[in-house]
Each structure stands twice: as structure tokens, then as C-alpha cells.
Design a protein with these regions (language model features):
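Alpha-helical transmembrane segments of multi-pass membrane transporters/translocases
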Residues: 10-33, 55-63, 67-71, 191-207, ...
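Helix-loop-helix units of permease transmembrane domains in multi-pass membrane transporters
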Residues: 41-52, 224-229, 290-319, 481
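Beta-strand-enriched, solvent-exposed domains that form extended recognition/catalytic surfaces
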Residues: 68-195, 199
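Residue-level recognition of transmembrane alpha-helices
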Residues: 241-244, 316-317, 324-325, 329, ...
Length: 487
């Protein structure tokens, strides 16, 4: 592989997933066209005029990358592994084999090349084969009673299994029953393909979510679309995106002098910068689209139409949220590219062996949960900013939300440091942790940079926390705005 192919392959895999998601969306739209052409036209209009339009440009760019880069990519391996995804799963069996029983059949369908590890234990000596009538004469694996036979990559124990297997034949020649336990872990030969269905599902989910909001809450969606379109047209949005792109590219070539840990510094700096830019965009938009419209009596004109105050606030919040999504998508893709390239770049600068593309993929895939958590943190601060904007202008809004951002990251530290100390300080720390969002839960850049993986359960709880706190902030915004005199 060329160096370009090495660092581009991880992004190409994600691009393939996005392309598959786009094809699924086109198929769904085609079915809708056959069933209800009016609904299909409405969907096409929604994609063409809302926030989905710039997102669609990004999707088309990813599809072009997936198509143009295919000749230099391991397409055959990727396709073969994709086909095998439904067939790989842990194999677990606990059986009792009668005394002097030969060729006891245990269903176990796997490929030897896909084995990640396996352990076979028995309280009696048994012979394990993949063919019948071998027994103890030609045993493939001989398991001693009370001594587990374990294999994993790099272990001194031979794997023994070769080719494909559908059944294990176990022979027990002892005079006592044998209790046998089998545990096998398998995975496709290119496990990186698991990112393809996730990318496809994320693409489909984003479009479906936007269309559901549009058709289930049309008035709210109109306000959200107008706010999002106005936000994207602002020079600030373009400026922040350009600053992010230039900074992310520059981070690759900045010498951090970390003795081989420059990739970690790049990941930490990049995630923090994207999050801060998104928060700045959210605070500015909330101030201009909510506070300024209230002060300029534009909100009074909007509410004179059949639009309620609740629809106005929720629409403004969604209108702020969609540009943040777009910013994370654009800067996130650039960030993934720079991290993947940084792995190859550092190896070249340090005169090390050229890394495999799987190493680039590993660094890339680890930062995606960090980007998700950064986005959830931005959502919380956007909701708080909307609530503050219903009563205060831009400058107080920026000061309050900036203070909440700082205290939200320090609340957990204050509580820990005040344990067993002054009662008043401990009380203030606990009060801050209850009232303010504990943003420290979303601050895991150090763990991600240190090659730690983020479990899906953690992302799930973070999503629930973000939804609940954002919902509470929007509820507070509705209370503030309900009795606000707009005249």
C-alpha cells in the first residue's frame, strides 16, 4: 500500500458506510414515490431547502470518495468480511458426555481464520476433532482432565483448527462421564467493517429524524429551518468552520515534543477545539436569533401568526441545533482525516516502520465517541443559552453561559477536594453539582487520547443526561418566555 492509501483507508471505510446509508435513503424515497407521490415531493423539498442540503453535499462528497478510491482499497476483503458479519458470534456449550462415548456431536460453525480465542475444559481426558471416527487415534486436540486447553493470538498453545468447521466431535474413553465446556470467540477477518453498518445507520437516522420533526411538528420545523438557514448564512459560521479546518490541518505539523505521543496531543487539542467552536456558535446564535428578535419585536410579528410561544422556543432551539450538527460533521470528517494522516506522518518523521492502515483506523475510531460526547455537551449549553436569551441580551448571555461552562467542568473537582473540609465549601460544591450541568462527564479527551475505549453504556447514559438536562433547560426557557412582554 502507498502512504496515501494507508491513511485514507479508514476514512474510505466510513465513506462506504455513508454511501450505503444514502442508497438506503434513495430506496426508501423511491418506495415512497410509488406509494405517495405528494409525500415524496415534500421529502425532496425538505432535503433541498433545509439543513439537509449542505449535509447532502457532505454525503455526496463521501460517496465520491468511496467510489474514486475503491481501485486502491482492499475491496475484496471488505466485501468478504461484510458477508460474514451475520455468521460470526461467540460459541458457548456445556455438555456431559457419557462414559466411553465416541464422536459426541457439538454444533459449532466457524472458520479457523476468524477465531479470536477459544477455551475447552473437561474434568476427564477427551479428544476433540472436526471429523468423525478420529477419536484418540488421531486427535486434533487432546484435552487433559482438569487442564483447560486455551488459545489466543500470541500464545504458545497451537490453534490446531484449520479451514471451516461445522461440528465438533468429542470422544470420552474414560469410565466416568465428562463435563465439557467450550467457549469460542470469532470475528470476521477484517473487523473494521463493523463501522460500515454503523455509519450507514447514522446517515439514515439523521435524515429520518429531521423529516420526522418536519412532518410531525410543521410549524416548529418552519421556525427551525428559518433559524438554521439564517445561521449558516452568517459570516460567523463560515469563519468558525474555516478556523477549525485550518487549525486541524496545522495541528498535524506542529511539533509537540512529546517523544512519540504527538497523536495523543492532536486528538486532545482537536476535540477540545471543535467543541469550543460549536459552543461559541450556539451562544452567538441563541443571542441573535432569540434575544435580538425579542428586543427588535420580530418575535411579536412571528407570534401574531398561528405560532405559539412553545413552538417558537422549541423551533429556535432546533434551529440552533442543526447548524451545530453540520459543524460537527464537517470538522469531524476533517479531524478524522488529520488523525489518520498524523499516524503516518509521525512514523515518517521518526524514521519508524510505515504503519499498517489498521493502526490508523484504530486511532480514528477511538475519537468518534469523544466527538459524540462533545456534541452532547454543546447541546446542553445551547439549551441553557436559549433559556438565558429569553430574558437577557447577548453580553450577559455569553458571561453566564461561559461561567456555567467553567463551573460545570470544575463542579466534580470542587466536591472531591472539599470532602472532609470546610462545610460551607462542601455545600457550595454539592449545590453547584446539583444545579449546574456536570460537564466533566463529557470531558474524556484524556482517556480517549490514552487509547482507552468508551463503552456504549457510557454513551447511552451521557445521551440520557444530555436529553434530560436540555429538556429541563428548554422547560425553563418556556417558563421565562411565557409571561415575557413582547410589545
Amino acid at each position: 500500500m502507498s502512504k496515501l492509501t494507508i491513511w485514507l483507508t479508514p476514512i474510505w471505510i466510513l465513506a462506504v458506510g455513508v454511501t450505503i446509508g444514502a442508497l438506503i435513503l434513495l430506496l426508501m424515497w423511491g418506495v415512497t414515490w410509488l406509494v405517495n407521490r405528494r409525500a415524496a415531493r415534500s421529502i425532496a423539498e425538505a432535503v433541498g431547502e433545509g439543513i439537509l442540503r449542505p449535509i447532502s453535499y457532505v454525503v455526496i462528497s463521501m460517496a465520491a470518495l468511496a467510489l474514486l478510491a475503491s481501485p486502491s482499497m482492499p475491496v475484496d476483503r471488505i466485501v468478504a468480511s461484510l458477508k460474514r458479519l451475520p455468521d460470526v458470534a461467540p460459541i458457548e456449550a456445556k455438555i456431559e458426555i457419557k462414559p466411553r462415548q465416541a464422536d459426541f456431536e457439538v454444533p459449532a460453525s466457524f472458520r479457523a481464520s476468524e477465531l479470536q480465542s477459544f477455551t475447552i475444559t473437561s474434568d476427564q481426558d477427551v479428544a476433540v476433532n472436526v471429523e468423525a471416527k478420529k477419536g484418540f487415534v488421531e486427535p486434533l486436540i487432546l484435552v487433559q482432565g482438569g487442564e483447560p486447553y486455551s488459545w489466543a493470538p500470541g500464545s504458545s498453545t497451537p490453534r490446531k483448527f484449520e479451514g471451516d468447521a461445522s461440528t465438533l466431535f468429542i470422544t470420552n474413553e474414560s469410565d466416568s462421564p465428562a463435563n465439557v465446556s467450550i467457549l469460542m470467540y470469532t470475528d470476521v477477518e477484517t473487523p473494521q467493517v463493523r463501522a460500515i453498518p454503523i455509519a450507514a445507520a447514522s446517515t439514515v437516522g439523521l435524515y429520518v429524524l429531521y423529516l420526522l420533526v418536519r412532518f410531525l411538528a410543521p410549524r416548529t420545523s418552519v421556525i427551525a429551518a428559518a433559524t438554521a438557514k439564517e445561521t449558516i448564512a452568517q459570516p460567523l459560521f463560515t469563519m468558525l468552520v474555516m478556523i477549525g479546518v485550518v487549525a486541524l490541518v496545522a495541528f498535524v505539523f506542529i511539533p509537540y515534543n512529546t517523544f512519540g505521543e504527538d497523536v495523543k496531543m492532536l486528538k486532545t487539542s482537536g476535540m477540545t477545539m471543535i467543541k469550543v467552536l460549536a459552543i461559541i456558535m450556539a451562544l452567538w446564535t441563541a443571542s441573535t436569533s432569540v434575544a435580538d428578535e425579542i428586543e427588535g419585536r420580530t418575535a411579536l410579528t412571528v407570534l401574531s401568526k398561528p405560532v405559539g410561544r412553545r413552538q417558537f422556543i422549541v423551533g429556535k432551539f432546533l434551529g440552533i441545533l442543526w447548524p451545530i450538527v453540520l459543524m460537527f460533521i464537517i470538522l469531524g470528517i476533517v479531524f478524522l482525516l488529520t488523525v489518520s494522516f498524523k499516524v503516518v506522518y509521525d512514523a515518517r518523521e521518526s524514521a519508524k516502520t510505515t504503519p499498517e492502515w489498521t493502526e490508523c483506523y484504530l486511532e480514528v475510531v477511538r475519537i468518534i465517541p469523544g466527538l459524540v460526547l462533545a456534541f452532547l455537551e454543546s447541546v446542553i449549553l445551547a439549551a441553557i443559552s436559549v433559556a438565558v436569551s429569553t430574558r437577557l441580551p447577548m453580553l450577559p448571555n455569553l458571561v453566564i453561559c461561559g461561567s456555567i461552562y467553567v463551573l460545570g467542568h470544575l463542579a466534580a473537582l470542587i466536591v472531591k477536594s472539599a470532602a472532609g473540609e470546610i462545610v460551607f465549601v462542601r455545600f457550595i460544591g454539592k449545590l453547584l453539582s446539583v444545579i449546574l450541568p456536570v460537564l466533566d462527564h463529557f470531558e474524556i479527551e484524556g482517556a480517549i487520547a490514552g487509547a482507552s475505549s468508551v463503552p456504549m453504556s457510557y454513551l447511552g447514559w451521557a445521551l440520557l443526561y444530555s436529553v434530560l438536562y436540555s429538556g429541563a433547560a428548554i422547560l425553563l426557557a418556556l417558563i421565562f418566555f411565557e409571561d415575557r412582554d413582547l410589545a
